[in-house]
Amino acid sequence: MKIKNWSHVGIVVDDLEMMTDFYVNTIGLERLHESDARPQLDGDHTGVPNVHRTLRFVGIPGDHEIELIYFIDPPATDGHVDVHKFGSTHICWDVEDLASVYEELKDKMKFVTEPKWRTRPDGSTVGLIYGQDPEGNWLEFTQRP
């Protein structure tokens, strides 16, 4: 098997409009495309019978995308996992200036800490911060050499 390319990460959301607003107007991604997803005649790949969803993609055109998945029927239920538990996930973006990203976003989202800097074995440093979107999904921003 050979992986050809990255495609997207999917996040199940409770409030599609709020989450779209956050990722577009706070994080700075673009709204790319959307579909009204209903099962095909041959069934549905999700394993949820007769599922009806709205799939909205945000991201950087020509690059990685985030699929915001809103379950219309049956509605989704809370399934958040603490950051230190199996099954926990996060999305990470590389940024040019971690300190300015933190200053710009600190009043718009919840961060766990201020930016932290780590020295790598080769002597270079990497900065990172962890935070959460409005529905509690984990986000990371890193500044690499």
Segments and roles (model prediction):
Residues V12-D63, S100, S124, Y130:
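Core segments of cupin and vicinal oxygen chelate
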Residues L16-E17, I60-H64, Y70-W138:
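Vicinal oxygen chelate
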Residues F141-P145:
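Short beta->alpha transition motifs characteristic of CBS
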Residues E34, L68-I69:
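Short, conserved beta-strand edge motifs with alternating hydrophobic and charged residues
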Residues H8, H52, H90:
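Histidine-centered active-site/metal-ligand motif
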